[in-house]
């Protein structure tokens, strides 16, 4: 099911709440709802993900690849937003990812264990209200510890 109608990507990011809504739509509708069309719609062609694996292309294609790799490793992955904050063109999102580790993640083959992975994401948006940059700080050490 596509949720492109959830927000109008042609509307300029005129207020902090507009871009916060885009980040909320990414996590709740695109990521949790497995909607690659929405990821494509909210991602600018010049999008750069500072946490992507080497060789990941920029733009919507790369953004979708990163998400699909995560879904392959944790097929039931679900992200719960704890806090959203924005200033001008930037949104910070703090939350926790939950799911079952079934495929390779951070170099570790699937364990079948439930995971809880705390994360902080930064998104920057262009004047068209599309994401142009992503960076993240994740508790990878805590996650790796849970794999033991």
Q: What do these predicted regions represent?
A:
Residues 1-148:
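C-terminal and inter-domain tail/linker signature
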